[in-house]
């Protein structure tokens, strides 16, 4: 199944729309302490199978991690279990920091 790969600019544009998408951060806690996108829901990748029922099914979900690999795997899993509007932040929070918010720490 194909998952939409959104650039940081596309994600920024999506955040201005209604309904606003849910930003799902699947990084580890120590990574989240370094930086995160405002308003994100944090569920580490390894807990997604146990907690995906906490996610809304009536708004788009944009999944992100550090570079976009873990989040792509989570997005594929969410689509597999029935979520219909799931996308991946291409390049992860690293790309976001480089292209949208240069004040965000890089790691």
Where are these regions (language model features)?
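Short, surface-exposed ligand- or partner-binding patches at beta-edge/loop junctions that are enriched
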Residues: 64
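Rhodanese-like catalytic fold shared by cysteine-dependent sulfurtransferases
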Residues: 1-22, 28-60, 69-107
